[in-house]
């Protein structure tokens, strides 16, 4: 899906997997990215069982040295996982193959081997909301942590349910 944005994205940008609910503040990830350079900086989270996720090896300079998507128990070398939130350079589009591909399986391992990925661990909460049960857990976390607020919907082409909320400071114009 990210490759479909190559015509409208330029420079440094943030990318977030749509099924993640977390307490991540992106500024420290961006700061590390600016400091270390490279093509990408990934937010990282520590888990007990990393076999459902992409795992990373991280050196003392916050460079990702290895990346393995959904390892078997025998392949696990770390409990730090890719938390589905990235700061990337538009150079990423130059190395993405056209058509269907997986950034986690086909792009990140090579970038890690080339020293082009950084990692920033965060604390708070992280929920992979890809199942109905975990989606409900994510909604509850947002309510508990007061992550909902209201912004503004302007113009005539957007449909907004009266129960929908737009975050403070955001404007939807269309």
Regions found by a protein language model. Give the residues of each.
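A residue-level structural signature of the nucleotidyltransferase/glycosyltransferase Rossmann-like core
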Residues: 13, 21, 55, 80, ...
């Amino acid at each position: 899906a990210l490759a479909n944005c190559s015509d409208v994205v330029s420079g440094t940008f943030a990318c977030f997997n749509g099924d993640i609910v977390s307490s991540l503040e992106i500024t420290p990830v961006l700061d590390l990215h600016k400091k270390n350079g490279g093509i990408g900086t990934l937010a990282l989270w520590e888990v007990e069982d990393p076999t459902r996720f992409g795992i990373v090896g991280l050196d003392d300079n916050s460079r990702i040295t290895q990346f393995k998507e959904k390892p078997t128990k025998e392949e696990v070398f770390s409990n730090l996982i890719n938390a589905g939130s990235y700061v990337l350079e538009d150079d990423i589009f130059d190395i993405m193959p056209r058509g269907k591909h997986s950034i986690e399986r086909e792009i990140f391992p090579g970038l890690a081997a080339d020293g082009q990925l950084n990692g920033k661990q965060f604390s708070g909460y992280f929920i992979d909301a890809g199942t109905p049960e975990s989606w409900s857990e994510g909604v509850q976390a947002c309510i508990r942590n007061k992550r909902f607020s209201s912004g503004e919907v302007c113009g005539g082409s957007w449909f907004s349910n009266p129960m929908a909320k737009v975050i403070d400071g955001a404007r939807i114009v269309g």
